[in-house]
């Protein structure tokens, strides 16, 4: 087992101390107030149905004031689909912003008023041509860039999928079922870089280890 998964398993505690009432590590809001940044206002720069870009006027605790760009994005759902052979469903795609070809888990935006788990399943089918065999299970919701953006990402997990057709031609033309241990090595080699995909693969790998 790779070092990444060993580290993940070692820290994978469902009842984390930070979430236990009265436990060490929990600090009250009143104690944190002196370090809280002040927000004086936020003005819109541009927006579309998926992303809102604005400039916020903020102040540091010691008094310095400045402006910072803020990105607010619609919620996304990403799914780790695994099979009974210990493989995960990945798609090969080009990301023009970083100008790289990378392997990713299927995922995308959750439409307004859409059930997030249903959106996760829809994205899997649209992007890969595989339909999840069950309703995807929500693993966690995380924020990948809280220093300058609000971009909630839901990570889902499901075992089994049925092949129902070809993926959307605008998404990818290369789909692969990759052994989880190989996927972990791809992360270590930098072939998988997306936050949701990295977390999803390591989570699936930890579940695989937990069952063994």
What are these regions (language model features)?
Residues 36-45, 135-137:
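Short secondary-structure junctions
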Residues 40-78, 84:
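Acidic, metal-coordinating catalytic segment for phosphate/diphosphate chemistry
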Residues 44-49, 96, 141-153, 209:
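Acidic pyrophosphate-coordinating catalytic loop
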Residues 73-104:
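A glycine-rich, hydrophobic loop/mini-helix early in the fold
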Residues 66, 73-78, 83, 108-196:
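Unchanged
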Residues 10-37, 64, 101, 112, ...:
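Nudix hydrolase/Nudix homology domain
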Residues 2-11:
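Single-pass alpha-helical transmembrane signal-anchor segments in small membrane proteins across taxa
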